[in-house]
């Protein structure tokens, strides 16, 4: 039976200068999108990286328990087996001297898939994310593909890895409006079809409105509000959520 709920409880991230993330609780459910929203510098990306134990040098996760369907698990078992990560800057996710086929082969090898079966699996996953020209994409290097195509390639690698959960850190911020819309459409399709559980980090309330089932609002390293998306938009409980919603409404009114 596949896992259905991944939780982090009491996540704390510190430097020598002090605490940056304070006792964060998050819950991801299969088939749902949980958005972690807040202003720049609020601790969203750090929380995402802390969950995967991928913090940069000088930062440490000093507290926090991971649970899968209520059972404790080690952080080392989360990456690759349970979760995949989509980064804000897609080019930084790929080795620039290796083509896409090399990245795909490495991912599939971790699943014990090789030879002709691997090639068929690559083609299937690339087609699922809208990268139809399979051979051209697989022979391409990161500098030869657009940002939108690289984001899709990261999703394809997640499908190859067959992880039940996906963490996406500001995945649309470097994309143009059309590529952003296509990426979000793809993400929602994969949630519905494959039952992915997604943690989507964003500062864009438009993205939240479009995708979110649950919303966690972050300010100064703390979760200040967490509730279903439709309730947050109707009755925001925190000043931070009200400020974000007001800014979103002003921006929408200013657009032609």
From Swiss-Prot:
One Pfam family per UniProt: ABC_tran
Cellular component per GO, a single term: plasma membrane
Compartments in which it is found: Cell inner membrane
EC number: 7.2.2.11
Record-annotated ABC transporter domain positions: 6-245
Class in the EC hierarchy, top level: translocase
Keyword rRNA-binding: no
Keywords recorded for this protein, A-Z: ATP-binding, Cell inner membrane, Cell membrane, Ion transport, Membrane, Nickel, Nickel transport, Nucleotide-binding, Translocase, Transport
InterPro entries: AAA+_ATPase, ABC_Ni/Peptide_Import, ABC_transporter-like_ATP-bd, ABC_transporter-like_CS, Nickel_NikD, P-loop_NTPase
MF terms (GO), sorted A to Z: ABC-type nickel transporter activity; ATP binding; ATP hydrolysis activity; nickel cation binding
Superkingdom as given in the UniProt entry: Bacteria
Record membrane topology: Peripheral membrane protein
PROSITE patterns linked to this entry: ABC_TRANSPORTER_1, ABC_TRANSPORTER_2, NIKD
Binding sites annotated in the UniProt record for ATP: 38-45
Catalytic activity: Ni(2+)(out) + ATP + H2O = Ni(2+)(in) + ADP + phosphate + H(+)
Similarity section: Belongs to the ABC transporter superfamily. Nickel importer (TC 3.A.1.5.3) family.
Function text: Part of the ABC transporter complex NikABCDE involved in nickel import. Responsible for energy coupling to the transport system.
Assembly information from the UniProt record: The complex is composed of two ATP-binding proteins (NikD and NikE), two transmembrane proteins (NikB and NikC) and a solute-binding protein (NikA).
Protein name per Swiss-Prot or TrEMBL: Nickel import ATP-binding protein NikD
Originating organism: Pseudomonas putida (strain ATCC 47054 / DSM 6125 / CFBP 8728 / NCIMB 11950 / KT2440)
């Amino acid at each position: 039976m596949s896992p259905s709920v991944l939780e982090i409880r009491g996540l704390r991230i510190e430097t020598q200068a002090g605490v940056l993330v304070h006792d964060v609780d998050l819950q991801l459910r299969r088939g749902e999108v949980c958005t972690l929203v807040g202003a720049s510098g609020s601790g969203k990306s750090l929380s995402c990286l802390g969950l995967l134990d991928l913090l940069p040098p000088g930062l440490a996760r000093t507290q926090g328990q991971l649970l899968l369907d209520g059972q404790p698990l080690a952080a080392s078992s989360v990456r690759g087996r349970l979760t995949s990560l989509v980064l804000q800057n897609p080019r930084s996710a790929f080795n620039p001297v290796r083509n896409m086929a090399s990245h795909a082969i490495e991912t599939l090898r971790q699943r014990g898939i090789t030879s002709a079966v691997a090639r068929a699996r690559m083609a299937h996953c690339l087609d699922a994310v809208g990268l139809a020209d399979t051979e051209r994409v697989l022979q391409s290097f990161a500098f030869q593909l657009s940002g939108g195509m690289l984001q899709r390639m990261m999703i394809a690698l997640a499908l190859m890895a067959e992880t039940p959960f996906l963490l996406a850190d500001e995945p649309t911020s470097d994309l143009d409006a059309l590529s952003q819309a296509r990426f979000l459409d793809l993400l929602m399709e994969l949630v519905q079809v494959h039952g992915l559980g997604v943690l989507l980090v964003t500062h864009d309330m438009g993205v939240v409105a479009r995708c979110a089932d649950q919303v966690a609002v972050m300010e100064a390293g703390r979760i200040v509000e967490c509730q279903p998306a439709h309730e947050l938009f109707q009755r925001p409980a925190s000043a931070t959520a009200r400020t974000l919603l007001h800014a979103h409404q002003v921006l929408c009114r200013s657009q032609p």
